[in-house]
Structure formats: structure tokens, C-alpha cells
From Swiss-Prot:
Catalyzes the ATP-dependent phosphorylation of N-acetyl-L-glutamate. GO terms for cellular component: cytoplasm. This is Acetylglutamate kinase. Keywords: Amino-acid biosynthesis, Arginine biosynthesis, ATP-binding, Cytoplasm, Kinase, Nucleotide-binding, Transferase. Its EC number is 2.7.2.8. GO terms for molecular function: acetylglutamate kinase activity; ATP binding. It is found in: Cytoplasm. The keyword Cytoplasm applies. The record marks 8, 215 as: Transition state stabilizer. Pathway: Amino-acid biosynthesis; L-arginine biosynthesis; N(2)-acetyl-L-ornithine from L-glutamate: step 2/4. The lineage of its organism: Bacteria, Pseudomonadati, Elusimicrobiota, Endomicrobiia, Endomicrobiales. It catalyses: N-acetyl-L-glutamate + ATP = N-acetyl-L-glutamyl 5-phosphate + ADP.
Amino acid sequence: MSELTVVKFGGSLTENPQAQNKFLEELTLISKRQNIILVHGGGPEINALLEKFAITSRFVNGLRFTDADTLGVVELALSGKVNRVLTTGLIKNGANAVGISGKDGKSVICRQVEYLGFVGEPVKVNRKLIDILIKSRFLPVIASIAADVEGNIMNVNADTLAASIAVAFKAQKLIFLTDVAGVFDKNNNIIKEIKIKEINSLIEDKTITGGMIPKIKGCAESVKKGLKEVWIAEGISGIQKIKGTVIKK
């Protein structure tokens, strides 16, 4: 199996057991005929644990500041809960899933975004560990935690991590599964395909707004770096016959 797809499972989908179970069933089936790398975040679980431990988040320009206490909760939520749930679900469905994070085997090296605390931006993907897993017919399930060159643990945006891994492995496809069905035009219809040259004008005329802007820009960067297609799709609709918006060159 030479074809590789990287799938990013949106944290919000973990709140929908039906969608999550359907996704895990389908991903198991797909993993029988092609290589899969699954990357995940876990915003809702992080928020729930922060509330449980009475840790108040502060935000810088709309982004969560990750102090030492918050980082411990982030790692507990992502590696200790979400990763375990997804890995166990895949195994129950028959997949050879292995749960890791970006820090394991120094798989993802990042640099600190200092104004956000213990938050990292991926700068290098070391393929060795993930390659071993894939070649041994395992399905890596990767939590969005990484480390800098000195081994300091960092919270990493899961979208960015998935894109970095997809580019490093020259994946045929990168799929962002979210709680929205894709990118919509001003008539509320899904835009089926966006060329990267069209993105700036879609942002300028406010077709693409809010949190979709950084996601689309990240998709465009991935395509510029060699990916053939990047999808933004609704997780609840499944991935066997994926429907959503595809970004191409």
C-alpha cells in the first residue's frame, strides 16, 4: 500500500459519539486498502478538564495562552483521553492502531511561540518512528503535542500539525474533518472546489471569514508545498464518499 492519506479529526466531533463511531468504522475499512495517519486535537476535552481543575484560561488575540498548569491539562486531555478513546475505538473495529503524540520519537520538532506560552509551531518532521509504524501496517493516531529541540513539551495546533505531517510524508490527500460541511458561498451553497489563486479574493469579499481563514490559508500552503488536494469536510457525513470543499493548485 503506497497511497497515504492524512486525516485530521476535529476536536468538536468528539462530542458527537454517533459521528465518532461512524468515522472510526469507516477509517478502519479504508486503512485495509491504503495507509492512514490520523491526527487529532481535543478542544472540548481540554476546556472540560480546565474547568474541573478550576484553571482559568486567558487569551491573546483570541488564542489560548498555555502556561505550565494549562500545558499539563492539555497533555492529559489529548494524550491521556482523546488519543486513548480514538485508538481503542479503531482497535475495536479491527484496525492496527497505535496511539502516540508528536513528541514521541522526536517525531515533530517545534519552535516556541513565546507570546502564547508553551505553544509550538512545527519546524521539522522526523519520519523515522511514523515510517516504522506505517511500514509495519500500523495506523498511527497522533495527538497534537510536540517538543522543541531541547525536549520542552509544547501544545501545537492540530491543523498545523496535520499539514506538516502530510507535507513531510508527501501524502496524496489531507482531509480536515470538522463540524461544518465545507466552505460556503454567499448563497449558503458549498463551494466544491477552490483553486489557491482564488483564496485571497474570497477572503477580500468576505466569502471566507472568521476561523475558516487560517484553515484555508493552511490548506493553500500545504498545496503549494506539494500536496495534490486538501479537503475540508463535515465529519458526520463520513469519509468513504467524502463531500465538502477541496483545495487544489
